[in-house]
Amino acid sequence: MKELYFITSNKGKLKEAKEKINHLDIEIIQLKLDYPEIQASDLKEIALYGLDFCSERFKSPFFLEDSGLFIEELNSFPGPYSRYVHETIGNDGILKLLLGASNRNAYFKSVIGLYNNGPIIFEGVSKGKISKEIRGKGGFGYDPIFMPENSEKTFGEMSTEEKNSYSHRGKALDNMVKYLENGVE
């Protein structure tokens, strides 16, 4: 079995990744390695910086993931600042910002950076809308307020398997899995 390190401290992200990759002969190992996250408006730029920084300190194959919630009514806010905004105002704060808003369209975007003899980027997008209230206790982050297209449930109301079928991270992981299935060393 090959080892592939996932640089994250987020157990929810780790669980999603393991479920997507479990059919491959690859062991996903969590690595809690702090790296600076540059302030940029582009998730791909942030991921590439993280890959470059971590590859200078860690020599085994690894991947990292950055994602953001982009809300149309708020001019794509919080976007790449999603983690900070969630830690600061949380889901309640986002719902307050959208009080009275008729446009609740939003999308999650995930960028996975894989480093294995060089950087490779995989992306995934999940379109949907922001619910009017917090619903569900599953998942993490904005999951209890994001409803993907073609679902009346929020990510917070879904099982991990169900969420993965809609998830931006799930789509980015699928793209990485297709790459890994081709036997890339």
List where the protein language model places each region.
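Anionic-ligand binding patches
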Residues: K2-Y5, G12-E185
